[in-house]
Amino acid sequence: MTASGLYLNLSIGSADAPILQVDTTIATRGITAIFGPSGSGKTTLLRCIAGLTRATSGNILFNGAVWQDQTQFLAPHKRPIGYVFQDANLFSHLTALGNLQFAIKRANNASANELLDKVVALLGLQSLLNRYPNQLSGGEKQRVAIARALLICPQLLLMDEPLASLDEQRKQEILPYLEALHEEFSTPILYVSHAMNEVARLADNMLVLNNGTVVAHGNLNQVLTDTQSPTAQGEDTCVVLNATVESKDTKWQLICARISNAQLWIKAPDHATAINQTLRVRILARDVSLSLSEHSDSTILNKLAATVISISDDTDSAMALVKLAVGSDTLLARITRKSAHHLALQPNMQLWAQVKSVAIVG
């Protein structure tokens, strides 16, 4: 147990039939994604942290302060948290501004009033302040709900699938606001999701739940490239890398960005990019093919010298997952077992990873 971080050692249910059993410490910085399939215990864990659900037994400490143990249970309103639910849960009789002012009163913090203008600008709420919730779209409601949670001046922000009730267009509208929130505020965020594209775009760290237990926890890419983790199975298997913009090819609308010791050609994004800017890129394992030699007569632009780390079984019995080292970075390739057999893949083998598609996610 450490004095810093969110320490969780809790269980719900009985010893014979546990619903949730967690023993870990979550870093109180950046965004930690709590990821897993439906029914894995994500929302239950978040509600325990918030005090909305009382764990059957165990301890919850936040930076050394006891929120729950054998003798005490801190009520939700006494925990320094903000909570954003799947549904915005705005007060229907108050305007957007009224909802924000309610949060400021609850905060009882002089800095909350000073924070109002910054939060309104950051989340693009200027034109919405005089509207009532029934006059707002789903995405607009969630932006107001996020602002309301921030104006409580929380030490920890909990977000329970805040985009789950939105259609794809609304999700794409709100994601840049969440990225801006991450950049502008130091408040640590626990972000519950079962959508890998959201996690890849937002998270610094990742905690994976399955059947009520923690099966992986750590830095985002460490978890994504752990071939024993559920995240490294199936069609969404991916890695997330930082790439530095080196040059632009305006003729072909491409940018060249560097990962550790290799270059990636990437379709230029709609927004402007600068030389030396760091981009977050996502590479799906299914978009990586392997070759024993470098092919120049191919439509694939990205051919990276790589070394095989391991070959693992996939949940699909016809597929295999190959873990690769590209300099100090790690890639995953999802190929057929027949292809792995044909190439006689072995650990430490040198080969070429051909990356069909690279997506900029941040």
UniProtKB/Swiss-Prot annotation:
It holds the Pfam family ABC_tran. One of its GO terms (cellular component) is plasma membrane. It is found in: Cell inner membrane. The keyword NAD does not apply. The gene is modC. Keywords: ATP-binding, Cell inner membrane, Cell membrane, Membrane, Molybdenum, Nucleotide-binding, Translocase, Transport. Its main location: membrane. Part of the ABC transporter complex ModABC involved in molybdenum import. Responsible for energy coupling to the transport system. The complex is composed of two ATP-binding proteins (ModC), two transmembrane proteins (ModB) and a solute-binding protein (ModA). Its EC number is 7.3.2.5. This is Molybdenum import ATP-binding protein ModC. Residues 1-236 form the ABC transporter domain. It is a peripheral membrane protein. Residues 297-362 form the Mop domain. One of its GO terms (molecular function) is ABC-type molybdate transporter activity. The keyword Cell membrane applies. SUPFAM superfamilies: MOP-like (SSF50331), P-loop containing nucleoside triphosphate hydrolases (SSF52540). ATP binds at G36, P37, S38, G39, S40, G41, K42, T43. Signal peptide: none annotated. Belongs to the ABC transporter superfamily. Molybdate importer (TC 3.A.1.8) family.
